[in-house]
């Protein structure tokens, strides 16, 4: 499966910890990420990650384009709900695309853990047939 990892600045440490904790599962899948998030995950875990621009420079839109092309199966986006983001319209557009195309989306660690367990059990294998 193809999984996107995105984290706002104050959530990047959480994403790195999450990726490290679930490294055995992530190793079985293809990972994509916005710039700094992808770099930090790669450096901390050794996982292969295809990196796009940082979110404010268009990375959220690049990942959104993948969703619109049915080229992503899951998005894990650790958002910082307490800090205003300069690219909030891009963030909202990405979340909307996940809804439009029925892409599983987690926006915090608790929901991301649920998705990872579902992924590991094969509960998301239906995505293979939506291509």
From Swiss-Prot:
Reaction(s) the record says it catalyses: dihydroxyacetone phosphate = methylglyoxal + phosphate
Keyword tRNA processing assigned: no
Alphabetized InterPro entries for the sequence: Methylgl_synth (IPR004363), Methylglyoxal_synth_AS (IPR018148), MGS-like_dom (IPR011607), MGS-like_dom_sf (IPR036914)
E.C. no: 4.2.3.3
GO terms, biological process: methylglyoxal biosynthetic process
Domain MGS-like: 1-131
CC terms in the record's Gene Ontology section: cytosol
Database matches in Pfam families: MGS (PF02142)
UniProt keyword Thylakoid present: no
Active site: 60
Sample GO molecular function, one term: methylglyoxal synthase activity
UniProt keywords, alphabetically: Lyase
Family: Belongs to the methylglyoxal synthase family.
Its biological purpose: Catalyzes the formation of methylglyoxal from dihydroxyacetone phosphate.
NCBIfam families xrefs: MGSA, PRK05234.1
Annotated protein name in UniProt: Methylglyoxal synthase
Organism of derivation: Bacillus cytotoxicus (strain DSM 22905 / CIP 110041 / 391-98 / NVH 391-98)
Designated gene of the protein: mgsA
